[in-house]
Amino acid sequence: MTVEFRPVKINDIDAIVEEYERTWGIAHAVGEDASRNLSRRFVLHYLEPSTFGTVATINGKFMGLLLARVYGDKVLFKQVQNMLEEQEAKMSSKGDSLHAKALDSAIGMGQIERKLEAMSHINDLTQAELELFIVSPDARGHGVGGGLWKRTMQHLRHRGVNRYFLHTDTACDVSFYDYHGLRRDATWAKKDHEKYANRVKDLVEDLYIYSGEPFVNRTKRFD
């Protein structure tokens, strides 16, 4: 099977949401409807500030995505800001406890991420952020993750980025970032914030900020 890489398109959103739900959905905690709406909210949240994005496909089927934001560059899709606001309003207007719980968890997670950014001063030390990195389990072994990473690092170098950062957590495979030479700059551990952790327990446990240089190279394929 041949992997093809191309720029992300606005009409990729549904496929991205489907894979996001498959990977990180919380239907077990809030039900299928609220979980899918939350996945759409997260995808729009990450897409809204993005200035660069690459999609991987196999035989036309979505297999992965990496979104990045270079500070000061033009966003990919201006209309996503309104789409995000509408999605959050839709979830709020549902009037049921499951949608309210899902949205509150996302807002709480965002607040933790902002605290980590402030603690680490990461926005002052970097020129870009990786917004969303997702690879379908169906694509493992085909070089999708490595291909998305390589193309994004090339773009960051082209845009003059010396250092970038990303948010990640215990629901993700952080060994990929260790392999590619990133360092952990900040940690929010559930055990140290038991009271607040209950707010985000359905989404994450521990959260991290990692940062790296787009010049660090790894030749071995990592899927």
Language-model features, listed with the residues they occupy:
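Conserved acetyl-CoA-binding loop-helix of GNAT-fold acetyltransferases
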Residues: 135, 141-154, 179
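Conserved beta-strand-loop-alpha-helix junction that forms the acyl-donor binding cleft
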Residues: 131-133, 137-140, 165-175, 189-195
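A short beta-loop-alpha structural element at the N-terminal edge
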Residues: 4-18, 70
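Active-site rim helix/loop that mediates acceptor-substrate recognition in acyltransferases
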Residues: 31-53, 57-59, 63, 67, ...
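Conserved GNAT acetyl-CoA-binding A-motif
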Residues: 127-128, 156-169
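Conserved acyl-donor/pantetheine-binding loop and adjacent beta-alpha core of acyl/acetyltransferases
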Residues: 72-128, 191-202
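Conserved active-site alpha-helix within GNAT-family acetyltransferase domains
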Residues: 116, 146, 158, 170-193
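Conserved GNAT-fold acetyl-CoA-binding loop/helix
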Residues: 21-42, 81-88, 102
